[in-house]
């Protein structure tokens, strides 16, 4: 997982409220188990409109998506986060998120930023013509016009995103501690160790 430090670029001024995961990635795309190519299915129904914002050359490869309240509601599907990543989105800014979507986004290295509606409205305005910047360390969203919006983030999530640590990475980072614990267990509970060794050898 790539570390998240600063994200800067044009932001897609989407702004729609109550966008569920079926809008983000339709169910027919869930048959795949690979993450590559899912960007083509992202917001597929909305892309039927030839004037849709997602196919606009102006916002091609934009790393930030500005959304409305309750983004990512509906059924749980990690493919929604995969699809956004495949589009090039590294952060989503919205007034609120579905808890499940927020968790899936975090596990896949997407930063979810919660800001009040007034800030969203201002960013939507700026995004029409100018870039937006997110600084994870400072926990701020800024614009070229001296706008500065602060956001809160769970310290654990911040640490993981800043260091590019997913669940596997976190486990590997504590490899020495795990090995030490296993050695102690073998000494203090040898009868359990025998069972573990038998399973490992099978």
From Swiss-Prot:
The protein's Enzyme Commission number: 4.2.1.33
Enzyme superclass (EC): lyase
CDD domains assigned: IPMI_Swivel
Catalytic activity, as annotated: (2R,3S)-3-isopropylmalate = (2S)-2-isopropylmalate
GO terms for cellular component: 3-isopropylmalate dehydratase complex
GO molecular function, one term: 3-isopropylmalate dehydratase activity
UniProt pathway: Amino-acid biosynthesis; L-leucine biosynthesis; L-leucine from 3-methyl-2-oxobutanoate: step 2/4
Segments forming a coiled coil: none
InterPro entries per UniProt: 3-IsopropMal_deHydase_ssu, Aconitase/3IPM_dehydase_swvl, AconitaseA/IPMdHydase_ssu_swvl, IPMI_Swivel, LeuD
Keyword list, A-Z: Amino-acid biosynthesis, Branched-chain amino acid biosynthesis, Leucine biosynthesis, Lyase
Described function: Catalyzes the isomerization between 2-isopropylmalate and 3-isopropylmalate, via the formation of 2-isopropylmaleate.
Oligomeric form and interacting partners: Heterodimer of LeuC and LeuD.
Name under which the protein is recorded: 3-isopropylmalate dehydratase small subunit
